[in-house]
């Protein structure tokens, strides 16, 4: 408990995201009484905090009662026409075709009527309080169906025989395999890698030379580290409705891919460029 007041004494002015606020305040008060925090140091911390708030004009906002804008004002700003237009422009200009197998794109129901859709996500690792219940992969699946594709969602077969599906059976059933990865990093999960399903990584992309295969990342732009041999790969950087609409326009050939990758999507691996 000495570490709490010691942190303030060492120059930390404020604690954020405490586990138990009342407990930490108790430690702070005890530290002040014990002399760990001097009156001068306490005054300095309070002055800095108040100065920061004043520089942001929070005292004026409090006096005017404008901390939270009226609903009418908020509705005139959130999702206003200008913001929607900017979002559409950003989506159209950012989606990146990292690499492609000649002849695979564009995707049309006439060319690939039967699509095996393989969603990858980490929602089972625990939902974030900042995300809604809509799955980005589900949004993409519905968009494919709306375009006229017959979409089958991949389900790993039960038992050991699941890893032994004949290649002939796959080629007879599907014209295209489309992977969609919605694997977002979080504050407590800064590295995200693909975890393949049982039995024995049954959803690993092993048909890339047999069935046209497209891999779409809706979040993390570094998935080629795990799927280097996928020959058509797209980074979207997000999976909201605006991005999915722009993606479908590009997949079907209604709009070109113009995005330039802001990072090295090949992760420094030569084999990912093949």
Segments and roles (model prediction):
Residues 1-274:
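Preference for extracellular/luminal or secreted protein segments
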């Amino acid at each position: 408990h000495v570490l709490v007041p010691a942190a303030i004494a060492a120059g930390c002015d404020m604690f954020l995201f405490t586990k138990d606020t009342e407990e930490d305040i108790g430690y702070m008060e005890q530290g002040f009484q014990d002399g760990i925090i001097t009156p001068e140091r306490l005054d300095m911390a309070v002055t800095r905090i108040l100065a920061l708030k004043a520089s942001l004009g929070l005292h004026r906002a409090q006096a005017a009662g404008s901390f939270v804008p009226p609903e009418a004002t908020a509705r005139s700003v959130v999702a206003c026409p200008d913001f929607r237009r900017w979002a559409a422009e950003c989506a159209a200009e950012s989606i990146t075709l990292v690499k492609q197998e000649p002849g695979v794109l564009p995707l049309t129901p006439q060319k690939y009527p039967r699509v095996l859709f393989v969603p990858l996500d980490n929602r089972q690792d625990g939902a974030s309080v900042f995300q809604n219940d809509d799955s980005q992969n589900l949004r993409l699946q519905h968009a494919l169906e709306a375009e006229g594709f017959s979409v089958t969602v991949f389900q790993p077969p039960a038992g050991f025989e699941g890893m032994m599906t004949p290649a002939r059976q796959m080629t007879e059933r599907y014209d295209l395999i489309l992977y969609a990865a919605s694997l977002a990093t979080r504050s407590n999960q800064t590295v995200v890698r693909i975890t393949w399903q049982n039995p024995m990584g049954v959803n690993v992309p092993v048909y890339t030379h047999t069935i046209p295969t497209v891999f779409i990342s809706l979040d993390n732009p570094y998935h080629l580290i795990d799927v280097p041999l996928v020959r058509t790969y797209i980074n979207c950087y997000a999976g909201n409705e605006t991005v999915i609409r722009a993606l479908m326009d590009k997949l079907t050939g209604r709009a070109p891919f113009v995005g330039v990758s802001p990072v090295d999507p090949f992760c420094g691996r030569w084999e990912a460029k093949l």
